[in-house]
Amino acid sequence: VGKFPLLANSR
């Protein structure tokens, strides 16, 4: 993760 911190946190 890093490019998509928001997406990873959304799960």
Curated annotation (Swiss-Prot):
Keywords: FAD, Flavoprotein, NAD, Oxidoreductase, Redox-active center
EC number: 1.8.1.4
Cofactor(s) in the UniProt record: FAD
Reactions catalysed, as given in the entry: N(6)-[(R)-dihydrolipoyl]-L-lysyl-[protein] + NAD(+) = N(6)-[(R)-lipoyl]-L-lysyl-[protein] + NADH + H(+)
Name of the protein in question: Dihydrolipoyl dehydrogenase
Record's cofactor remark: Binds 1 FAD per subunit.
Entry annotated with the keyword Flavoprotein: yes
Family listed: Belongs to the class-I pyridine nucleotide-disulfide oxidoreductase family.
Organism: Populus euphratica (Euphrates poplar)
Signal peptide: none
Keyword Flavoprotein set for record: yes
Subunit structure, interactors included: Homodimer.
Broad EC category: oxidoreductase
Additional remark text: The active site is a redox-active disulfide bond.
GO function terms (MF aspect): dihydrolipoyl dehydrogenase (NADH) activity
Function field: Lipoamide dehydrogenase is a component of the glycine cleavage system as well as of the alpha-ketoacid dehydrogenase complexes. The pyruvate dehydrogenase complex contains multiple copies of three enzymatic components: pyruvate dehydrogenase (E1), dihydrolipoamide acetyltransferase (E2) and lipoamide dehydrogenase (E3).
